[in-house]
């Protein structure tokens, strides 16, 4: 067995999954009734950074709907070091020289993406219908940026931890 995972930075192993100690979970529930109603619930990794839940349901030839939660971590680097002061923050300052990397600021590159959404569709009078969709995506953490150390190409570049905290809300209606 071969692995290129370095024990000093296991971020590739954890890039999109929460592998910390804890209980793993995976649930699938399905229900059907004689009146045509149905539901499906699927969930995994409850309470973890990579939690997923999906609830669908409806009534045949009448309506259907869905609610979902999808959390995805994206680890880019663990215990990274930078000579910049106050990292990670929106105010990055430097104090050079700092020859000893053990005194540099430590941080984790990565962000958490949380998507919550759903839809409802009424189709009782087929082919006529209406549908409402909505979701909200929250992203929080650090993304990688870069900057030149000067105006000459010989000065090199430095990676910057750029704080990210934004929310996107989407909605649609069709009939």
Named regions from a protein language model:
Residues 11-16, 38-40, 101-106, 117, ...:
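Extracellular loop and loop/strand-boundary signature of outer-membrane beta-barrel proteins
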Residues 1-3, 41-45, 57, 67-71, ...:
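Transmembrane beta-barrel strands of outer-membrane/channel proteins
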Residues 35-39, 51, 59-65, 114-116, ...:
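Outer-envelope beta-barrel architecture signal
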Residues 7-14, 52-56, 68-70, 78-84, ...:
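Outer-membrane beta-barrel translocator domains and adjoining extracellular loop/strand segments
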Residues 4-9, 47-51, 61-63, 73-79, ...:
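Gram-negative outer-membrane beta-barrel proteins
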Residues 20-25, 47-51, 110-116, 167-171:
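Residues that define the transmembrane beta-barrel architecture of outer-membrane proteins
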Residues 1-35:
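Outer-membrane beta-barrel initiation region
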Residues 27-31, 53-57, 118-122, 173-175:
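Residues on the lipid-exposed face of transmembrane beta-strands in outer-membrane beta-barrel proteins
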